[in-house]
Amino acid sequence: MVDFATRVAKSFKDKVSGIDNKKGTDIQGVLGLDSTPNVLFASVFAAGGGSYDNFFYKVENGRADFRNFANKGTSYKNLEKVYNDYKNLIGSNGLFASKDGSYSSNFEKFHQLAFYVGSSSGYNYAFADETAKRLKFGDSAIEYPNDTLEIKAPTNNSQSGDGNGGTNNDNLLGTFDIREKSNGKKGESNGKQGNGQDKKTISLYKDSIPKEKTEGTDAILISDNQLINQLQTAAKTSSSQNKANTAAITFKQSNKSETDQSTTSQVIGYTTTASLKADKKNIFDVKKLNNEKSERKIIVGATVETLNQANTLQANEAIIKPAPGKYQSTDSHKVMITQGPNIVGIHANEKEDKETQKFINWYLNKEESWSVQNSGSTTTKKQTAAQYFAEQSSYITPLKNNFKADQSATKDSTVNTNYFTKQTFDLFKEVNDGKVLGFNDPSDFRSGKFRNTIGSTFNATISSKVDFNKFFENFKASLGSGFER
C-alpha cells in the first residue's frame, strides 16, 4: 500500500504540491492516515509476529514494560523499517496525516486524496450527499458542518430591547433561528425543521444583553473583539448591498414590496455545534445555549460553495477494503486493531455489584424505543442500548452470538446498511474464529503519553522530512523520563 502510494506520488509530481505551499483546496496527497499511532502500532505489531514480546511494550502485573523499546530491541528495528518506507512517501509529498480534526475523509470526499486508512466510526462523515457544500475562506475550505445555521444581520425591525420599547441596535450583532419542540420542552438546537417544532430566535450581542433577554436562553454575549469587528463589517456590507437592491426596485412595485425588501436579513456568518477547531481568524468559540451539550462556534468571512456529484465521492462509488493486516506479505499473522469503549466491571460491594449486573443485562438484552434520524426524518426504533449505541457510532457489537448467527439475520442492523461496519463485522468474525489477531494497546498510566507522542512526532516529519535517527531522537526527547523500563 505504501509502495503503491509512493509510485503514484512520484508519477504525478505536478499534482502533489509540497507541504509548505499546500492550500486547503489543493490535493492533499495520495494516502491519508486518520491515526498515525494506529498505523505505526499495527505495523510494528504485525512485523513482530503478532507477539507483545516484540512490541514497544507489554503489560505484566498491571505495569508496562518498555525495555524492548528502550534497549532498541525488535520493536525498534521494526519501527525503523516501517518509518523508512513511509519516509519515501513523505519525500514524494504523497502522505496526509490527520490533525486538528481535519480527517482524511474531509478531503477524500472532495477528491483531494486517492485513498485513506480510517475507522468504521467515520462512516457518517466519509461521503458526500448528492449535492455537497463547503465553506471557503481564502485558500482554505471546510465541509459545511452538520447542524449549521445562518447568522442574519440586524434589520430595521430588530429589537435590541432597551426596556422602553426602543429599537436601539447598537449592541445587536446578528441573530440566528433554532427549532424547539412545540410542547415547550427544550430540544437540542439543531436547526432542523420538522413537525412539532417551533422557531426561536437567538440574538448575538456585544457589551451587554438587554434585561428582557436571558443569556443562554435567547441571547449570547460575544466578547472577542475580532469576532465582533468581523460581524459588524459583514453587517455593514450587507446593509449597503441591501440599499442598492432597494434602489433598483421599479416605481411599479408597491410600498409594501419596498418595505419587505428593505428589511430582508442578509447572511453575515454561520454558527454550528459541530466539532471544529477554533482558529480565531474565521472560526471562533462562543458560549453555548443552556440546553446544548456540544460547544458552539461562529464562522465568519466564509462563502458557501455547492458541489455536484462529479466533484464529490458518494458511498456507492467507493471501494472499501479492510486495512492491510500484514505489513509485509511474509508476516506470520494478520492483525486488526480493535478500538472502542470497553465495559470494565470494578468491584465495590455486593449491592453495587448486583446493580452493575442489572445495568449490563439491560444494556445488552432489554429492547427500548429510540428516536432515530433517517434521511432528515425522525422515526422510532426498538433496539437494545448496545445496538442503538453501535448503530449511532458506526461500531459493531462484538458478541459471540452475533458471529454465530447468519449475518443477514443479526439484530445489528448497521451490518447490512453500512459499508464500514460490514467489513468490521467480517474482520471481528475472523478474530473470533482465530484467523486474525485482534490488537489492543497494552495500557498503564504511561501508555497514553507514548501513543500521543509517537503520533505527534511522526506527523511533524511530514514537513521536516528528517531521517529515522533524528525522528527517534525527537521521539525520545518528547517522551521524557519514565520509559527506560
Curated annotation (Swiss-Prot):
Disulfide bonding pattern of the chain: none
Biased composition (Basic and acidic residues): 177-189
Region (Disordered): 151-201
Biased composition (Low complexity): 155-174
Family: Belongs to the MG185/MG260 family.
Name listed for the protein in its UniProt record: Uncharacterized protein MPN_147
Organism from which the protein derives: Mycoplasma pneumoniae (strain ATCC 29342 / M129 / Subtype 1)
